[in-house]
A protein has these predicted regions:
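Aromatic-rich, solvent-exposed beta-strand/loop patch
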Residues: 116, 161-178, 196-248, 272-291
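A structural "hinge/loop" feature
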Residues: 52-68, 91-93, 119, 168-178, ...
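Alpha-helical secondary-structure segments
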Residues: 47, 122-129, 155-157, 199-200, ...
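Extracellular/periplasmic solute-recognition and catalytic clefts
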Residues: 149-151, 204-213, 244-301, 311-312, ...
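N-terminal lobe/hinge region of extracytoplasmic solute-binding protein
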Residues: 49-100, 131
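Surface-exposed binding/hinge segments that line
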Residues: 41, 108, 142-183, 191-207
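N-terminal export leaders
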Residues: 14-18
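Aromatic- and charge-enriched surface segment that lines or borders ligand/interaction sites
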Residues: 94-139, 153, 159, 255, ...
Length: 323
């Protein structure tokens, strides 16, 4: 299984959250996990207790963390983030060559990346995927307003031309929710019925309200750089991943303590002391940052339509008060 943040929620947050897993390999740098020695070495399968049944397995259409947490094992983007939130290449060979006017991005793909269907990834797959993302993804639609064209240049080249300079382009392509996933062009449909990506796991089966089953992709084309955040080398240490919906947080806690789950997502912080006293069955990891706190003002009507008042509120309520 990918060791680089495989099961973490996608965004670091500003409040403490708890998770628990049975393996160091499952631990990621977001929220609280409890990991134990059982999964620290390669093994055949793992059961992962998630907060709900995913509404869809289409990571473009949904911005839900749950969907991305599962399907980031199946699909990969052109770019992603390292541990310091710098944009780094994933399916792209390197960062793009940007024209002097900031309008043209020339992207070269890694050679020999295998799709789950058994053939190599080509530029046509990337173009078709990005066009679908622009049409279907909430994030992609916003980016699409800035894009003049997306074209393949040979087997491994992709050119994105913008209408005007757009600084967030690479970050938007790297975001792991509503993500710009790259898929085999022949699998593209709405809704998706075939999940053909390049990730370290391939989709095997979904039984609604029971599980989503992923199996290791033995021909996975990993990057050579060391794992770093979402970037770098990803390794599938476990043969099968079974994601099960367990909406009740207390059930996730008890299941983790009983050894029923190898990983349990988003547990109440109040469970920390029990997990710490589990006799080595679980190893909790607490991250005090989880989520993005922000204020939203109604600028159309009411007292906060006044910009000076909004600035006063912003000054009075600094980041410390929001945390």
């Amino acid at each position: 299984m990918p060791v680089n943040r495989s099961f973490s929620p996608f965004f670091p947050a500003r409040r403490a959250v708890l998770q628990v897993a049975a393996a160091t390999a499952l631990a990621a740098a977001c929220s609280l996990l409890a990991t134990g020695p059982a999964l620290a070495q390669a093994r055949h399968h793992a059961t992962l207790a998630m907060v709900a049944e995913p509404q869809t397995l289409d990571p473009m259409v949904s911005t839900a963390d749950l969907v991305g947490t599962i399907m980031q094992h199946v699909y990969e983007p052109l770019y992603t983030f390292d541990a310091k939130w710098n944009v780094v290449p994933m399916l792209a060979e390197g960062l793009p060559k940007v024209s002097a006017d900031g309008l043209s991005y020339a992207i070269t793909l890694r050679r020999g990346v295998m799709l789950h269907s058994g053939r190599e990834l080509h530029a046509d797959d990337v173009v078709a995927s990005l066009q679908r993302w622009i049409e279907m993804s909430p994030r992609g639609k916003a980016v699409g307003k800035e894009v003049a064209s997306i074209q393949a240049k040979g087997a491994l080249g992709v050119d994105i031309v913008l209408k005007a300079p757009y600084a967030p382009l690479l970050s938007q392509l790297a975001l792991p929710s509503g993500m710009a996933t790259i898929m085999a062009k022949e699998s593209i449909a709405l809704p998706l019925t075939s999940f053909v990506g390049t990730g370290p796991y391939r989709f095997k089966e979904r039984k609604p309200d029971q599980y989503v089953l992923l199996t290791r992709f033995d021909k996975y084309s990993a990057r050579k750089e060391p794992a770093n955040g979402y970037g770098g080398k990803r390794e599938a240490l476990i043969e099968e991943l079974r994601f099960v919906p367990v909406p009740n947080a207390n059930t996730r806690v008890e299941g983790a303590l009983a050894g029923q789950y190898d990983y349990a997502d988003l547990l109440p912080v109040e469970a920390l002391s029990r997990l710490e006293k589990s006799g080595g069955k679980t190893v909790p990891i607490l991250t005090p940052s989880f989520g993005f706190p922000y204020l939203v003002f109604n600028t159309k009507e009411g007292v906060l339509a006044n910009q000076a008042l909004r600035q006063a509120v912003q000054t009075a309520m600094g980041p410390g008060e929001m945390l």
